[in-house]
């Protein structure tokens, strides 16, 4: 239950951050070197991410891992 909830929360944070930067899912997925479909599942909270992918995401956003996780409970 907790992991499902945190995956959804993380996905919501990613979506808001991506939209704030004016990027489409396709553009952001390319920056992270993953498919748009896979990225979409992450945004919807349907898939957990590895630490390696979290690092790619934070690099693509130009933020630290700490900043990426700052709004999670």
How does the language model describe each region?
Residues 43, 53, 72:
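DNA major-groove recognition helix of helix-turn-helix
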Residues 67-73:
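Short amphipathic recognition helices of helix-turn-helix/homeodomain-type DNA-binding modules
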Residues 52-67:
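DNA major-groove recognition helix of helix-turn-helix/homeodomain DNA-binding modules
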Residues 15, 26, 55:
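Residues within the helices of the helix-turn-helix
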Residues 22-41:
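Short alpha-helical DNA-recognition segment
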Residues 37-40, 47, 66:
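Key DNA-contact positions within bacterial/archaeal DNA-binding proteins
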Residues 1-20:
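A short, Lys/Arg-rich alpha-helix, primarily the initiator
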Residues 19, 30, 59:
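Alpha-helical residues within the helix-turn-helix
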